[in-house]
C-alpha cells in the first residue's frame, strides 16, 4: 500500500477517540479553532464530518503564478480562501479516505462547514508555503 489514502486510513485505524482531527503536516489550526472544537462537537452530535476553512499563504507568489494556476487572492493575501478541507470526522468504520492523489473522504452521511461568521471568523487552518515549495509540489502532483 503506497498512496496517500492508504496511509491516512492506516492512521484512522489507530485512532481511539469519538472524533478524528486529521491535518496535514504543513497545516496548523488557529487557536480559536482549537478552543471552540469541544463545544462544536458536543453541540452537533449528528454531524459525521466537518469542513474547515483553510488560509493558504504563498511567500513569493507573483501575478504570473496567480494567473497561471487560476488562483484567487484576497486583500489579506490568502489564496483561494475559504478553501474548505475535510479535516474533522467521526471515528466510525464507514468513513474512509479514497483516491491515490487529492484524496477525499467517503462513507459519511452528514456534514457541515464551519461558517465564516457567527463567532467562527478566526476558526481555520493555517497553511503557509513558499513559491519554491508550491512549484515543487505542483510538479510532483503532475507526475502522479
Where do the PLM segments sit?
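Short, acidic/turn-prone active-site loops that include or flank metal/cofactor-
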Residues: 1-2
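Catalytic-site signature of metal-activated, phosphate-bearing donor transferases
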Residues: 5-13, 19, 28-144
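Walker B catalytic motif
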Residues: 25
